[in-house]
A protein has these predicted regions:
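Small-residue-enriched hydrophobic alpha-helices in membranes
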Residues: 1-121
């Protein structure tokens, strides 16, 4: 079954977000993140995409996200920043995880840079 590029992107975004929440080991609500609404509006993410995300790998999702438009990459970065900012202080491991994710999708931005952008909006 082949997916459209839009569907592949949505599922890849959900896969990465679910993996991040799981790795954080706390119950974080993705949908209550400040920037998630904009990300959802821009990509048309539906609840079913989170279900679909359970059957794809994080690695294949990163490959998909590399080709995504930079506006969407920015919204993903801001949403991940929202998730991580729920933990105070944000641990070094989370900052490194953020930068590793951004490098993997070819959107090299540091956590401190995205945090500054997030706070000025």
């Amino acid at each position: 079954m082949s997916m459209s590029s839009g569907e592949s992107e949505r599922i890849a975004i959900c896969c990465v977000l679910l993996d991040i929440v799981e790795a954080m080991g706390i119950s974080a609500d993705i949908k209550s993140c400040r920037h998630y609404q904009s990300l959802r509006d821009k990509t048309d993410i539906a609840d079913s995409d989170f279900e679909g995300a359970r059957s794809v790998s994080v690695l294949s999702s990163l490959v998909t996200l590399k080709g995504m438009h930079y506006n969407k990459k920015m919204l993903l970065a801001l949403t991940v920043c929202d998730l991580f900012s729920g933990q105070t202080p944000v641990s070094l491991n989370l900052r490194i995880a953020f930068e590793t994710l951004m490098n993997a999708i070819e959107w090299p931005i540091s956590f401190s840079e995205i945090l500054a952008i997030s706070r000025t909006e």
